[in-house]
UniProtKB/Swiss-Prot annotation:
PANTHER family: SEC-INDEPENDENT PROTEIN TRANSLOCASE PROTEIN TATA, CHLOROPLASTIC
HAMAP family, alphabetized: TatA_E
Bias (Basic and acidic residues) ranges: 63-77
UniProt keyword terms in alphabetical order: Cell inner membrane, Cell membrane, Membrane, Protein transport, Translocation, Transmembrane, Transmembrane helix, Transport
Regions annotated as coiled coil: none
Subunit relationships: Forms a complex with TatC.
Segments of this protein annotated with the region Disordered: 56-77
InterPro entries linked to this entry: TatA/B/E, TatA/E
Disulfide-bonded cysteines: none
Pfam family, one: TatA_B_E
Subcellular location: Cell inner membrane
Protein name: Sec-independent protein translocase protein TatA
Length: 77
């Protein structure tokens, strides 16, 4: 298990220190808060990536349409 470069022994030490600092009653609340924050960050990141993809596709379509409009066409007699 290696989350953010933190192994299991380091994670245990962090949890013990958090337990000592915040106490057993406050720890679940902090965990829920961190979980909600993580989900919100992931959702914002996903929305950002989707918007970048949409903008890139729109720009490519615009460039393709411009190239087609500027390309010379054969005129048949």
């Amino acid at each position: 298990m290696n989350v953010f470069g933190i192994g299991l022994p380091e994670l245990i030490v962090i949890l013990v220190v958090a337990l000592l600092i915040f106490g057993p009653k406050k720890l679940p609340e902090i965990g829920r808060s961190l979980g909600k924050t993580k989900r919100a960050f992931e959702e914002a990141s996903r929305e950002f990536q989707d918007e970048i993809k949409r903008q890139t596709a729109a720009l490519e379509e615009e460039q393709q349409a411009k190239a087609e409009a500027e390309s010379p066409r054969e005129i048949s007699p």
